[in-house]
Amino acid sequence: MTITNEQVERINELARKKKAEGLSEAELEEQALLRRAYLDSVKANFRSQVETIKVIDEKTGEDVTPDKLKEIQRKNGMRD
């Protein structure tokens, strides 16, 4: 799930309002939902990036990618 620029702007708007004057209960709930969506998006993007990494030993040139990561990559069709 990706978060839109409008959602990020709304998160920032609510943060500014909270600091300046406080938020209503509805706004607090909206802020919590938007923040959760934002964090879920960041986590998904980070996981996607990590799952495509291949670790190579500089000295030997061997693939030293952890087995757990290799298994995930195989499940996603990125390894033999």
From Swiss-Prot:
Q: Which InterPro entries match?
A: DUF896
For this record, an example GO cellular component is: cytoplasm
| Highest taxon above the source species | Bacteria
Q: Which UniProt keywords apply?
A: Cytoplasm
Where does the signal peptide begin and end?
A: none
- Enumerate the subcellular locations listed in this protein's record, separating them with semicolons: Cytoplasm
Q: Which Pfam families match?
A: DUF896 (PF05979)
Q: Which PANTHER family match?
A: UPF0291 PROTEIN CBO2609/CLC_2481, UPF0291 PROTEIN YNZC
Q: Which family does it belong to?
A: Belongs to the UPF0291 family.
What is the name listed in the Swiss-Prot or TrEMBL entry for this protein? UPF0291 protein llmg_1475
